[in-house]
């Protein structure tokens, strides 16, 4: 059995903690034979290979008496880069418990569990459903809507450095004025409505008008303004911080993606530029 979970790009500008899209980088978990103790074979650096791994600890939160197995974990989702690496592991852990214990969890069940573990649905929701997901988490209740993302390419600049979510949240204000909250929510409303309508031009303007988090976080990602200005020269719809950063994501027409990637590569930033697409399947079990 193999469990595959996509990477995710959250917030998409003003959709703070509530909007995310699944993209084409993947975590895979291969389930091998039963064992006396949990063991995860991986080449992902200094992460646990036993029940202290987030994958296993999540699965055991769902079902505490699971039969241990030998597993193989592989991932091309960069760690601590704003592409949902931890969320993908949480979703995989829930699916592992679901399969091994035959729990018959619905996708909504999985989302409820994942959101309680993660604290917000913006990454775990698209990792489960695929596509674009808008979700809320209020009073421990999750509400979500899934739709297809308008046709475009995602050009991701992934810096060589990590940025922990805790550090990125640390620069945010504790509150907004009523006036700013109204303005920020109106921008978010237009962004989501335009994405649902398939209008990337209007969506792009609203995405780049975010007032919730990017103005505070962009000082932590020195490449952000440079890439945003460069992308505008190539007809990009919008550039935004993916999740808590530091990945800088640009939405661009498909026929401009390669040219933009080449341009970003050409300015000598320390990182990797990738062209990604929307993953429409979410978590998959083979």
Swiss-Prot record:
Pathway(s) served: Amino-acid biosynthesis; L-threonine biosynthesis; L-threonine from L-aspartate: step 4/5
Organism domain of life: Bacteria
Entry keywords, A to Z: Amino-acid biosynthesis, ATP-binding, Cytoplasm, Kinase, Nucleotide-binding, Threonine biosynthesis, Transferase
Entry's Gene Ontology cellular component terms: cytoplasm
EC number: 2.7.1.39
Gene3D superfamilies (alphabetical): 3.30.230.10, GHMP kinase, C-terminal domain (3.30.70.890)
Free-text function comment from the UniProt entry: Catalyzes the ATP-dependent phosphorylation of L-homoserine to L-homoserine phosphate.
Protein name, UniProt field: Homoserine kinase
Organism expressing this protein natively: Streptococcus thermophilus (strain ATCC BAA-250 / LMG 18311)
């Amino acid at each position: 059995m193999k469990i595959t979970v996509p990477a995710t790009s959250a917030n998409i500008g003003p959709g703070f903690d509530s909007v995310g899209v699944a993209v084409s980088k993947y975590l895979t978990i291969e389930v091998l034979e039963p064992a006396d103790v949990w063991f995860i074979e991986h080449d992902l650096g200094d992460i646990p290979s036993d029940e202290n791994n987030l994958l296993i600890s999540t699965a055991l939160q769902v079902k505490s008496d699971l039969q241990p197995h030998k597993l193989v974990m592989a991932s091309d989702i960069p760690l601590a880069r704003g592409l949902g690496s931890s969320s993908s592991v949480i979703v995989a852990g829930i699916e592992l418990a679901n399969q091994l214990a035959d729990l018959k969890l619905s996708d909504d069940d999985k989302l409820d569990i994942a959101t309680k573990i993660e604290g917000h649905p913006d990454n775990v929701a698209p990792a489960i459903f695929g596509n674009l997901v808008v979700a809320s988490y209020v009073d421990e209740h999750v509400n979500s809507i899934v739709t297809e993302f308008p046709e475009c390419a995602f050009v991701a600049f992934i810096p060589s450095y990590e940025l922990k979510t805790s550090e990125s949240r640390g620069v945010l204000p504790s509150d907004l004025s009523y006036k700013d909250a109204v303005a920020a929510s109106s921008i978010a409303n237009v962004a989501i409505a335009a994405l649902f309508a398939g209008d990337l031009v209007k969506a792009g303007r609203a995405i780049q008008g975010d007032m919730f988090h990017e103005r505070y976080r962009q000082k932590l990602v020195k490449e952000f303004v440079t890439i945003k200005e460069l992308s505008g020269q190539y007809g990009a719809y919008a550039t935004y911080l993916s999740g808590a950063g530091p990945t800088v994501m640009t939405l661009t027409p498909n026929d401009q993606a390669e040219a933009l990637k080449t341009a970003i590569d050409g300015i000598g930033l320390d990182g990797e530029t990738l062209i990604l697409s929307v993953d429409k399947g979410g978590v998959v079990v083979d």
